[in-house]
């Protein structure tokens, strides 16, 4: 990480991320992280190391993007077309923005449409309504209400926005996987470089990419689980294998952060580094997420 000069400023260096830290950037980040889930494609079964060229993708500025970056590209494309997709009062209203209008915004460059598009449309409507009715029409007001506390903001997010409330039951106990809520806070912190709206006195929440951790030797899978992953078998939501992967994922992130914090690297920067490593080395990563 030190060799590559990875730091809090690295987030804004990506051309698809907002370059200016302002209220518009907050609304952009909220929309992206609201929809940042499940880009799995059945087409990827055919090629184990690289995404299929026929899978869902977004064409933007003469480039094609998949996964998380396709989401960023679609939103930027809409904003350039003067569609205010990051404005809650706009996207909450079916009169101002129809479901077909949302489908147009996330139109694919291939025949495969965005995965779980109906679920994403539902999340957009629901979140927009909450922001307008409870928070003055902007996620900025959620941040100010948190009073510079990441823990407070996490609570506000998970108590008010169903899409971010990721919970499961494991052996009779409720477990909480607030991955995207944590990423939302982390992205705001990174965009503002820990200042102004991105200033949190307790910024210590984040998650890690398990596939990259496996490749780096920080996480091991049992032979039976590896067989499932190698065969591209869909692991059911809330199943024991899924919950154990996600739980160990978080534990590894915490352990890794403890060993690196003395060098000025916190859990968020570590997560961004590992996520970028996974993206840049996806052809080397043999097993699915």
Predicted regions and their residues:
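Phosphate/adenylate-binding glycine loop and adjacent helical scaffold
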Residues: 1-178, 220, 224, 278-281, ...
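Hydrophobic core segments within long, regular secondary-structure runs in both alpha-
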Residues: 154, 158, 182-185, 210
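Glycine-rich phosphate/ribose-binding loops and adjacent secondary-structure elements
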Residues: 163-203
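Accessory, usually C-terminal, subdomains that scaffold auxiliary metal cofactors
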Residues: 186-254, 259-289
């Amino acid at each position: 990480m030190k060799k590559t000069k990875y730091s809090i400023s690295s987030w804004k260096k990506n051309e698809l991320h907002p370059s200016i830290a302002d209220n518009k950037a907050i609304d952009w980040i909220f929309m992206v992280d609201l929809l940042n889930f499940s880009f799995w494609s059945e087409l990827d079964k055919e090629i184990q190391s690289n995404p299929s060229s026929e899978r869902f993708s977004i064409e933007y500025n003469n480039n094609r993007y998949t996964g998380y970056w396709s989401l960023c590209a679609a939103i930027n494309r809409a904003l350039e077309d003067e569609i205010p997709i990051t404005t809650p009062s706009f996207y909450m209203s079916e009169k101002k923005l129809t479901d077909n209008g949302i489908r147009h915004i996330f139109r694919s460059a291939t025949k495969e449409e965005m995965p779980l598009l109906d679920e994403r449309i539902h999340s957009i409507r629901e979140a927009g309504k909450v922001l307008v009715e409870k928070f003055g029409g902007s996620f900025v007001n959620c941040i100010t209400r948190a009073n510079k506390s990441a823990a407070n903001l996490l609570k506000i997010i998970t108590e008010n926005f169903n899409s971010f409330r990721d919970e499961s039951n494991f052996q009779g106990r409720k477990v909480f996987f607030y991955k995207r809520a944590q990423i939302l806070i982390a992205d705001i912190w990174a965009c503002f470089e820990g200042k102004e709206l991105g200033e949190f006195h307790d910024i210590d929440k984040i998650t890690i990419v398990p596939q990259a951790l496996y490749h780096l030797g920080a996480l091991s899978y049992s032979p039976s689980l590896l067989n499932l992953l190698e065969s591209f078998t869909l692991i059911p939501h809330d199943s024991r294998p899924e919950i154990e992967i996600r739980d160990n994922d978080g534990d590894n992130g915490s352990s890794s952060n403890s060993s690196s914090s003395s060098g000025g690297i916190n859990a968020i920067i570590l997560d961004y580094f590992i996520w970028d490593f996974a993206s840049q080395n996806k052809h080397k990563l043999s097993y699915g997420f």
